[in-house]
Amino acid sequence: MILHANLVDLHQRQIYSVALEVQEQKIQRIQKIASDANLPFLLPGFIDAHVHVESSMLVPSEFARLAVVHGTVATISDPHEIANVCGMQGVEYMIDNGKQVPFHFFFG
């Protein structure tokens, strides 16, 4: 499948119109094309570097469902609140629940 987009290069601080070759949900090749401001923009997902998922009053899988629509693809999560209330059993629940979705939770 070939997709066309404006690729936001955060390192070079540039935007390039590109043709992306995608196979099995992975980008195989990127080729620059003539500039086209009407194409959708493609940029890396965001990582929330400090969050207490349990403060949202949501289980990790539901938190992920809502966060991903805003561009967040991962969190570095501090589970101290659930740990204070439920101990290791609560932390293990959060980890296990987070594994049910294609979102990356890093608990520490």
Annotate each language-model stretch with its function.
Residues 1-34:
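N-terminal metal-binding scaffold of metallo-dependent hydrolase/deaminase domains
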Residues 12-14, 41, 99:
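A generic structural signal for short, solvent-exposed coil/turn residues
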Residues 15, 56, 84-87:
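Alpha-helix N-cap/helix-start motif
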Residues 16-18, 61-62, 89-90:
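Surface-exposed beta-strand edges and their flanking turn/coil or helix-capping segments
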Residues 65-108:
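Divalent-metal coordination cores built from histidine and acidic residues
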